[in-house]
Regions:
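C-terminal PAP-associated
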Residues: 1-186
């Protein structure tokens, strides 16, 4: 289901909330006849927080498969997705996203979804250093600049991810990181 999260995200050290009510498909790519897509959604599976909905739409069969990615009590938001295998025929996806709650500062994370729609454990790409507090009003803008790019023709699966985190000056910091994995073996 496609709906807007009810509450904005909390952040450690400050009562100001992070705006997550920008609900729309955030990222897509097309490979092997499948449209891969991701967006933010509320789901009761992780409490009253936002999660990431990741889907695969098979164009030829017109079938859709979904999975929800989150952690109890944590807001996961603003996903960016990309094919993550050295084998073009393999439907592995890397998702980078932003995370926050009242026990952590806003940070950048990533995980992989395999061909069977199973998610790996998420990894911390960049920890937040502090809370964000520089906007006007009760909420801080969040998630405007999350991105991902694949390095094509690489021996290993390789992507570059970009996201924002809380800097020590209480503003947003930008972070760019390379993520690689061991090569997939042909069937």
């Amino acid at each position: 289901p496609y709906s807007t999260p009810l509450n904005d995200a909390q952040q450690k050290g400050n009562g100001r909330r992070l705006d997550i009510k920008k609900n729309r498909i955030r990222s897509t790519y097309f490979a092997n006849g499948i449209l891969h897509y991701a967006y933010i959604t509320p789901t009761s599976a992780f409490g009253a927080v936002s999660a990431i909905a990741y889907g695969r739409y098979d164009v030829s069969t017109k079938s859709n498969t979904m999975t929800y990615i989150g952690a109890t009590g944590f807001n996961y938001a603003f996903p960016a997705i990309m094919h993550f295998s050295n084998l073009d025929a393999k439907n592995n996806t890397l998702i980078t996203f932003l995370a926050s709650n009242n026990t952590i500062y806003p940070e950048v994370r990533a995980l992989m979804i395999d061909e069977k729609m199973q998610a790996s454990a998420s990894i911390q790409v960049k920890a937040g250093d502090s809370y964000v507090n520089y906007g006007i009003g009760n909420n801080e803008r969040w998630g405007d600049y999350t991105g991902i790019a694949r390095k094509y023709n690489s021996v290993n699966p390789e992507v570059w991810v970009f996201g924002c985190y809380g800097e020590t000056n209480n503003r947003w910091g930008n972070y760019l990181a390379q993520i690689m994995a061991q090569p997939d073996l042909p069937p």
